Amino acid sequence: MGSEMCIRDSVYSTDYNVYHFDAYFNTVYSAVNGVARSGLNSGVYGYYALILAPILKLIGGGINTFIILMAALSAFSYMAAAYVIIELVSNNAVRIMAVTALIVVNCSLHTGVYFQLVPHRTLFAGIILAYLFFGVKRKYCYKPVYIIINVCLLMISVIWNFETGIVYTIAVAAYYIIDNVKKYNFKQAGLYTNTLIVVLALIGTIAGAWVITGIINVLMGGSFISIKQFIFPLMNSDYFDYLRYEYQKGIVAWLITAFFGLFFIGNVFFNSNLNTGDKNIDDSRYDAFMAVVAVMALGQMTYYINRTAYGNLTIVHFTTVIMIAVFADYCIKNYQKSKAG
């Protein structure tokens, strides 16, 4: 799959969207050559170049090397998402269909040189979900080392691309908030103190990513990056207005994503202390994890909402496939139980 993505994304394989490739690679090329970010050297895709530049310098900073690196990162993200599906879903037929859909759909649609969506805005979705699920399964989520690695991953995702990184950070924070909701009811102080800690950690993660980016830019000979510049283009309404289109009419894919997202969020709160007041509620955290997938999907979909070209809905492909697979697996399990009973 990595090879397939590499061939399809090769700047030599097609002349379609080469300007997009130039726009994406230019920032990396500048960083590799030590050019700091400034008003004349900026970009709307985030500070991914600061992460890619050291790797490219190590293995060779040419275009071909860059394409291979992006293909490898993309393949790793797909494998991470496949790991989540294989571990969450018990029915083998659903597993096979979900993993196949995960790979084939994106690869078949990816016919031009356009890194800005896949893998740029989907890369950390698979990686962060896989790491969180690993922690949930192994019960590592509150281990100090696990949390430190998690925060580092989230900071890197924010530096890579702010508009998706902040969604991933909020989604992971949502897991810990939901876990508190499962443990405590409204009358218990732990609900509020622990939630406050999570919110402060969320703010600290974003602030940490900003400070690290600013320091690196200063070390490269530039100025410290302002918070407005760091989160661009989210504070620039003209950028979004320029790229706004009409939504598709009728029953379309984004409604399916929205339905499953709201379903899994509703499910986790229905099975919480806020609803039942039951202190002996099941300690399983898989429904909380699925709520994280849902939050991530709905948050990522804001990219599509602001740029409603149909192909941009690919940004929620990972999360939507996971939600549909888990829902289908749940339905099959219940059908088999009712049939056996």
Where are these regions (language model features)?
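Transmembrane catalytic cores of multi-pass membrane glycosyltransferases
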Residues: 8-49, 58-73, 80, 100, ...
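Hydrophobic/aromatic-rich transmembrane helices and adjacent perimembrane loops
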Residues: 167, 305-339
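Specific aromatic-rich, kink-prone transmembrane helix
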Residues: 120-140, 152-153, 173-179, 319-323
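Transmembrane and membrane-interface helices of multi-pass
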Residues: 96-108, 293-298, 323, 327
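Short, small-residue-biased leader/transition segments that mark boundaries at the very start
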Residues: 2-7
